[in-house]
């Protein structure tokens, strides 16, 4: 990572939460940036590089960490669906010390990338990669996250199946996405009852509103 991008990353982390601006967190996210940059040309992980990768992806994934953190604690089980490039799963894992995190990714090459990157970031102890489609996942989780994944109408029953009672789903959304349609899917679901709310959050140095769609399993 070039010096100017490192300084940008450090500034962004401090703006989100000064307590996260530690050598360990910064080093992990810097390594994630380097791994994505190295493998992106071959794997097509994310359509961004340089400053855009730092702000629109890494910092965007980190920005709502306090919203997620307030719903769990050390030892909480979190599943990140469609992890692909590690966004947001590996970004969150860098900050959520002591959480038990599973990165769910069905594609072999991307699952391999995730395994290598978990090891490179020094997080093998509490982060594992599950190379399966969501429909095949059998474990249960306290918290589920995803970003740029499938629509709720395609996954709502699986979310219900693997989320414990009292658990929460955090779906990263841009302001342009049709959140109302997603909420209608949730309200019409005939399985368990989900409560929902939409939380806005800001990303440092990004002049665009971002939103988090939160589901609570009653």
Each model region followed by its residue ranges:
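A short glycine-rich, Lys/Arg-flanked "PGG" loop and its adjoining helix->strand segment in the class I
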Residues: 156-166
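A short SAM/SAH-binding and catalytic strip from SAM-dependent methyltransferases
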Residues: 142-155, 173-175
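Class I SAM-dependent transferase core
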Residues: 1-75, 79, 109-122
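Active-site capping/gating segments
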Residues: 174-218
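Residue-level signal for inorganic ion chemistry
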Residues: 36, 92, 173, 215
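Conserved SAM/SAH cofactor-binding pocket of Class I
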Residues: 62-146
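Short alpha-helical
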Residues: 108-109, 136, 150-154, 177-178
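A short hydrophobic/small-residue beta-strand
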Residues: 169-170
């Amino acid at each position: 990572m070039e010096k100017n991008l490192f300084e940008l990353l450090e500034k962004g982390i401090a703006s989100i939460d000064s307590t996260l601006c530690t050598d360990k967190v910064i080093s992990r996210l810097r390594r994630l940036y380097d791994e994505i940059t190295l493998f992106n040309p071959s794997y097509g992980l994310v359509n961004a590089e340089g400053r855009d990768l730092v702000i629109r992806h890494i910092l965007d994934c980190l920005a709502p960490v306090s919203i997620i953190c307030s719903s769990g604690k050390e030892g909480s089980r979190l599943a990140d669906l469609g992890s692909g490039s590690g966004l947001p799963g590996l970004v969150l894992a860098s900050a959520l010390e002591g959480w038990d995190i599973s990165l769910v990714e069905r594609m072999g090459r991307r699952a391999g990338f995730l395994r290598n990157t978990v090891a490179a970031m020094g997080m093998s102890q509490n982060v594992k990669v599950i190379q399966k489609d969501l429909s095949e996942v059998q474990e249960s989780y306290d918290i589920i996250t995803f970003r740029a994944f499938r629509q709720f109408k395609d996954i709502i029953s699986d979310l219900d199946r693997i989320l414990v009672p009292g658990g929460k789903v955090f779906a990263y959304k841009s302001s342009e996405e049709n959140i109302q349609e997603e909420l209608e899917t949730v309200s019409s679901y005939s399985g368990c009852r989900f409560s929902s709310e939409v939380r806005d959050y800001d990303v440092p140095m990004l002049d665009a509103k971002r939103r988090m769609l939160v589901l609570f399993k009653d």
